Amino acid sequence: ACADALERLGARVSRVDAGRDLAEVLVRLSPDVCFNALHGAWGEDGCVQGVLETLGLPYTHSGVLASALAMDKTRAKAVLAAAGVTVPGGGLYDRRLAAVIKPNAEGSSVGVFIVEAGANAPPQAIAADDWALGDEVLVEPYIPGLELAVGVMDGRAMTVTEIVPSSGFYDYEAKYGEGGSTHVLPARIPPEVADRARRLAEISHAALGCSGVSRSDLRYDAVNDILVLLEVN
């Protein structure tokens, strides 16, 4: 979609998959600028950004430091909390409470599990020998309510989007599977809550040193009027 839009604007576009030969391909193409449309590990964690900087190629969106920091959920939460942003707690929780377990450095909800109230063991997948998403996992209290997303472009927050998964929670399948979720724009929330969400997204974008475009993911508990920023992409 990004490439199609750029071509409609008159740009000459080469579509490149980020494989092991990425540097070789980029040297051969010698582009004027690289539009980074990657998700998850390598594309969002500063690795590809580092390759582009090493090659001296201009690129869109955030740089190495901001990308690496935003991908590391634990460190990003520390920075955001210091900036006054409400973030979920983290650490050990009473096993009788519902909780969310996720890899510390992954994207697109890969490896995210919701532990229901009363469960006394982590999901079997995390204990399995073939778990390949890192030794560190982040445990957070489960926040009921609405899934919200706020895009920030050049420091300015866009309209708040409400995301409604077809079933369960907003996991990998809900994000990328056909019919996995419905996006409601603008979100069905009070105007003052939308203003708070946009402000949190702008503060977070700046605190992490992001540039270009970012997206903040939030949860809103309408019963208790709690708005929490989960992470910045």
Q: Where are the regions that the model predicts?
A:
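ATP-binding N-terminal substructure of ATP-dependent carboxylate-amine bond-forming enzymes
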Residues: 1-65, 69-71, 75
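Active-site nucleotide/adenylate-binding loops and adjacent lid/helix of ATP-dependent enzymes
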Residues: 13, 28, 68-146, 198
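A short, glycine/Asx- and small/polar-enriched loop/turn
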Residues: 28-31, 96, 154-155, 222-228
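Glycine-rich phosphate/pyrophosphate-binding beta-alpha loops
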Residues: 40, 109, 166, 233
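Short beta-strand-to-turn element immediately C-terminal to the catalytic PLP-Schiff-base lysine
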Residues: 112-118, 152-154, 221, 230
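Phosphate-binding site of ATP-dependent enzymes
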Residues: 122-199, 226-228
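Conserved metal-phosphate-binding beta-hairpin within the catalytic cores
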Residues: 141, 205-233
